Amino acid sequence: MDGFLFNSRPLDEYTLADSVIPTTRREVFTLSSGDATIYGYYVKQPDSLRVEPHPVIVYHHGNYGHLQYYWDRVELLYKTGADVLVYDYRGFGKSTGTSSEASMIEDATAVLNYLYSRTDVDTTQIYHYGFSLGGFPALYSAANLHTAKGVITESIFASGEALIQTGTLVNIPGSYLLKGEYNNVALAQKRTCPLLMLHGGSDTFIPFAVHAQSIYDAARQPKTLIKVDGAEHEGVPQAFGYDFYISRIRAFIRGN
């Protein structure tokens, strides 16, 4: 039942809006990750708008579709003044292969290696943003792969086990349905960088009390949890108000 986690949609080509991010500001890249090829985009601020030290946000998207589906979220992060990297997991969009817990770790490692290979990236200024499923590679990267500057999570689950229990009507252990643990509670405990958690108060798919609160309670400092009243699973930026959402993310990446 890993399809419960990986609701991917393959694409032959990406069609991305350019009203906020001009085509001249985005670079497509491909990476080898295990036996798969990973596709993504690096979105770069104009030199005239760069502020040093210059942050980079790695956006780890949710379990549906492909990066094109999340492009409006990339645009919001671009408006914070940071560079943004977004990529597709295996089997999503143009990326090849099949996703699993182990492959997500491999893909996140390949993405970080790519960032560290770029001469225009300050590797002390890398932030991870994980939405829903993307909370796992975001927290894993910060806990195990490098010294991240900070992590932002939005609408993430506590663990695969907890997700199965709250997201289905099947009352059996999650290990019968998922091949991985996806233990975000343990990763939040292990990471040492600042953590900003955003979660909708009206999220019925990943309920706040079961998931966000339990992660926050277990996580070490520094940490901040914001319950966004009225927001459903995908509705945090809208319920916040786009301008306030952008300013809150900007304050986090400028204040650490």
Regions inferred by a protein language model and the residue ranges of each:
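Membrane-embedded segments
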Residues: S32-Y114
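Short beta-strand/loop motif that positions the catalytic acidic residue
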Residues: K190-T192, M197-D203
